[in-house]
Amino acid sequence: MPHFIIHCSDDILQSMPQSEFNQHVYSVAAHSGLFVSGDIKVRVQAFSTYLVGEQQQSFIHVFASIMQGRTVEQRAALSRAVVTKLTSLFPDTPNIAMNVDEFEKATYCNKAMLG
């Protein structure tokens, strides 16, 4: 963790390769100073059928899932930094947003913790 799961309209990946898109979000997260670089996970899921309001408009939405312990200000700065970067890369995309959700350390488990 943390996980950055990006949902976007499929036209986004027609203008930039997925690997490059992932790298941009990864770089912003790594430079935030909030995470160990090797722990950051980024992935994209593109959609061909969707509605934004009542129409099919291009969109990018980043869902960040991070372990508890960061301040509201840190989480807000992370969102702002990612949205700022994506806005610079996709200036014609009308809908770009991000939210940050926290999960409890006490309930988190991964394979390495089992043994």
What are these regions (language model features)?
Residues 2-115:
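A domain-level signal for the structural core that forms small-molecule/cofactor-binding pockets
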